[in-house]
């Protein structure tokens, strides 16, 4: 089997490409980073290093790379031959990469699974929409499967530009009914993807966000520094207890299953061999205060059902206190708050009602 993976960054190489290669699939990376593309083409291999005491290392071999800046004959041929097309580029980039290969799908004769592996809900639907806007209706040999992916890959600098360190844990879940053909190892195929997407978003992403914003507020430089602070961990556990209420109420996970999942996630945050700067995890504040995102979505549910929400109120307030002037969204947030106030910002960007906004503002002013 052959795969084309768009996005030769750390997630692409250390997670998606690694899993595909482990299934004996020939992987061609497509990217616009000339340095990475040239290195992959020259070496045809790279190391994936686990963030554990042993630094367990796996050599990923038999890979190639193509510049995807424009539709070349080489990229066209790779798409025509591909059995799987995956992405890890950021959901906002999906419409851009769609332009680089969508027209070729009209010419494909073999079946292909297209899976967007992004940190966003139903990202493959976003990619599919962008593709169909270009191509119009496609044949029934083109299959779009949504997925949920989870693996922490921190910012890093390695001696070899291609080597990548990743946490030992990973989860890749794919819609079973939308997938065509043989199921792959290390991927969980499920009938309903939504519970897994929501559980990950409202446990991993919400927890990570709380650690970043609390860490920044209380003077901690890294997520690991934050998770060593007992007061911050108490806030973390309170927040994840509250998001667990939402998850258990809305999906088939039991309280015991969700509690075990929370402990596993906190254990990942505590990994001493894996840490991220709070400024990397915290960036993108306007997106992260959105009504369907990691803080406001569960908070709104708890508010509407008159359930405990003290932790999430503080998480929202800490986000509003975030002050990284190297992040465009945070600059926009700070400027809006300075001009119009916190409540107006929440009404504009979080789309919440006056009373819930007032609850957040009260906590914000007490910090």
Swiss-Prot record:
One GO CC annotation: cytosol
Protein's GO biological process: mannitol catabolic process
EC number: 1.1.1.17
Catalyzed reactions per annotation: D-mannitol 1-phosphate + NAD(+) = beta-D-fructose 6-phosphate + NADH + H(+)
Lineage, uppermost ranks: Bacteria, Bacillati, Bacillota, Bacilli, Bacillales
Alphabetized Gene3D superfamilies for the sequence: N-(1-d-carboxylethyl)-l-norvaline Dehydrogenase, domain 2, NAD(P)-binding Rossmann-like Domain
GO MF terms, alphabetically ordered: mannitol-1-phosphate 5-dehydrogenase activity
Organism (species): Staphylococcus haemolyticus (strain JCSC1435)
A Pfam family of this chain: Mannitol_dh
Binding site for NAD(+): 3-14
Keywords tagged on the record: NAD, Oxidoreductase
The name this protein goes by in its record: Mannitol-1-phosphate 5-dehydrogenase
Protein's UniProt keywords contain Oxidoreductase: yes
tRNA processing in keyword set: no
Recorded family membership: Belongs to the mannitol dehydrogenase family.
Coiled coil: none
């Amino acid at each position: 089997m052959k795969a084309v993976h768009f996005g030769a960054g750390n997630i692409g190489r250390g997670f998606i490409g690694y899993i595909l290669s482990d299934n004996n699939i020939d992987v061609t990376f497509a990217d616009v980073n000339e340095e990475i593309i040239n290195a992959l083409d020259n070496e045809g291999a790279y190391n994936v290093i686990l963030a554990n005491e042993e630094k367990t290392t796996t050599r990923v071999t038999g890979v190639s790379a193509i510049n995807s800046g424009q539709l070349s004959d080489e990229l066209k041929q790779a798409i025509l031959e591909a059995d799987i097309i995956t992405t890890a580029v950021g959901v906002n980039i999906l419409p851009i990469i769609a332009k680089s290969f969508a027209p070729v799908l009209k010419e494909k004769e073999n079946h292909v699974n297209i899976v967007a592996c992004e940190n966003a809900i139903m990202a493959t639907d976003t990619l599919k929409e962008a593709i169909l806007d270009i191509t119009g209706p496609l044949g029934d040999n083109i299959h779009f499967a949504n997925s949920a992916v989870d693996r922490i890959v921190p910012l890093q600098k390695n001696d070899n530009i291609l080597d990548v360190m990743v946490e030992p844990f990973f989860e890749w879940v794919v819609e079973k009914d939308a997938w065509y053909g043989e199921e792959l190892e290390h991927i969980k195929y499920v009938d309903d993807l939504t519970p897994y997407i929501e559980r990950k978003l409202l446990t991993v992403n919400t927890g990570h966000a709380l650690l970043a914003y609390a860490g920044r507020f209380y003077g901690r430089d890294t997520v690991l520094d934050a998770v060593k602070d007992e007061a911050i961990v108490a806030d973390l556990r309170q927040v994840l207890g509250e998001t667990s209420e939402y998850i258990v109420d809305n999906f088939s996970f039991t309280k015991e299953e969700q509690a075990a999942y929370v402990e596993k996630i906190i254990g990942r945050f505590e990994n001493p061999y894996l840490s991220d700067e709070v400024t990397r995890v915290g960036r993108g504040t306007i997106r992260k205060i959105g009504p369907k995102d990691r803080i406001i979505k569960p908070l709104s549910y708890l508010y509407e059902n008159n359930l405990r929400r003290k932790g999430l109120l503080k998480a929202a307030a800490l986000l509003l206190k975030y002050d990284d002037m190297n992040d465009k969204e945070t600059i926009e947030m700070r400027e809006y708050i300075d001009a119009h106030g916190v409540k107006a910002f929440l009404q504009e960007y979080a789309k919440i009602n006056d009373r819930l906004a007032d609850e957040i503002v009260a906590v914000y002013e007490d910090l």
